Amino acid sequence: MKLITNKQGLVGEITVPGDKSMSHRSIMFGAIAEGKTVIRHFLRADDCLGTIKAFKALGVKIEETDEEIIVHGTGSDGLKQAEGPLDIGNSGTTIRLMMGILAGRDFDTVILGDESIAKRPMNRVMLPLQEMGAKMHGKDGSEFAPISIIGNQSLKRMEYHMPVASAQVKSAIIFAALQAEGETIIHEKEKTRDHTEHMIRQFGGEIEMDGLTIRVKGGQKFIGQEMTVPGDVSSAAFFIVAGLITPGSEIELTHVGLNPTRTGIFDVVEQMGGSLVVKDSSRSTGKLAGTVVVKSSELKGTEIGGDIIPRLIDEIPVIALLATQAEGTTIIKDAAELKVKETNRIDAVANELNKMGADITPTEDGLIIRGKTPLHAANVTSYGDHRIGMMLQIAALLVEDGDVELDRAEAVSVSYPTFFEDIRSLLK
């Protein structure tokens, strides 16, 4: 696919699609709640539609209209055995959280996905769930999908110190803990996104959060809700960076989710001297949302690492692009988790941006980016990773000497089906 190149800047207002993490979880909690859940501004992208498909296969009635998704909950014990394997496509969130949701059911399940999912590590979820009494294994006894879950296992409480900072692992344990006897205690390594915890409370459940320690009791009942999903800050990040690095730009992003566990990119933009203002903030779905305004800016390099990394892990590819347009060196460290995303994002970012003229060195746990560098025409690939594909489209906006051809552009539909249309709507 030939990407959009434009040196004239981007001007206008857009509303980014609903938050991907919250869209997944709204279906999951709606399914195990009693009564009806109505979800507005749901992310209708491949990953989240895969979650809907999986719960329909488990006997949950889900209606889809133009404006909303309506989930008719089965209650905490009402899921039914699927007729065949659950195919969750490309969604790491779906497979890992479903492992927790299905760990204590009275039926067997097989969960599989695409070739990317088949390469992603699952022991980080499987081992703590097995410690709770779940029986599950990967293909041929490995940790890789397809994952087979054996039913009719009683789950017991656990105190668990997480070895990695992962909201997916934490959420899988929480979902399993809801089916276990007693109180499960989870100690996080670093603070990660907390949508699951907040949604438990929103659906009428109880959970204690004290710093890095979470306590959740089993046997809880949930009540269906009406909710509006705020815009995904990870999707907004591409337009934030586009507005900062394309000369003459000013972009307003409305109804963006402002959960503090997700807004690390705002802190980085401030460190680098970028113009980013948040206004009109309000509560939506129990979460803060607001309008984010960005303008083209002169940027300087910075160092990014430590406990901010879980707050911006999905934004690192586009932050790396931002750093190519900053004066000086930017160092990103403590981000080895990038190696086990849809692709090895450390290598993918360095390989593809270097093709375009960037000066980036990959490291074991991050990137060293030397700026400021002009970007040039090239043939690039997304590696089938939606965030790499969208980052490369933003990079292409700076190219003046020819075309940028993107291979595997279809990956973008995993999280943002209207991405290219929204870019075009902002062209001067």
Curated annotation (Swiss-Prot):
PANTHER family found in the cross-reference section: AROM/DEHYDROQUINATE SYNTHASE, PENTAFUNCTIONAL AROM POLYPEPTIDE
SUPFAM superfamilies in the cross-refs: EPT/RTPC-like
Pathway: Metabolic intermediate biosynthesis; chorismate biosynthesis; chorismate from D-erythrose 4-phosphate and phosphoenolpyruvate: step 6/7
The protein's enzyme class: transferase
UniProtKB keywords: Amino-acid biosynthesis, Aromatic amino acid biosynthesis, Cytoplasm, Transferase
Protein function: Catalyzes the transfer of the enolpyruvyl moiety of phosphoenolpyruvate (PEP) to the 5-hydroxyl of shikimate-3-phosphate (S3P) to produce enolpyruvyl shikimate-3-phosphate and inorganic phosphate.
Reaction catalysis annotation: 3-phosphoshikimate + phosphoenolpyruvate = 5-O-(1-carboxyvinyl)-3-phosphoshikimate + phosphate
Biological process, per Gene Ontology: amino acid biosynthetic process; aromatic amino acid family biosynthetic process; chorismate biosynthetic process
GO molecular function list: 3-phosphoshikimate 1-carboxyvinyltransferase activity
Compartments, record wording: Cytoplasm
The keyword Cytoplasm is assigned to this record: yes
Annotated NCBIfam families: aroA
Active site (UniProt): D314 (proton acceptor)
Name assigned to this protein: 3-phosphoshikimate 1-carboxyvinyltransferase
Family statement drawn from the similarity comment of this UniProt entry: Belongs to the EPSP synthase family.
Residues given in the record as phosphoenolpyruvate binding sites: K20, G92, R120, Q168, R345, R387
Main location: cytoplasm
InterPro entries: Enolpyruvate_Tfrase_dom (IPR001986), Enolpyruvate_Tfrase_sf (IPR036968), EPSP_synthase (IPR006264), EPSP_synthase_CS (IPR023193), RNA3'P_cycl/enolpyr_Trfase_a/b (IPR013792)
GO cellular component, one term: cytoplasm
Subunit structure: Monomer.
A Pfam family that the UniProt record links to this protein: EPSP_synthase
EC number of this enzyme: 2.5.1.19
Organism for this UniProt entry: Listeria innocua serovar 6a (strain ATCC BAA-680 / CLIP 11262)
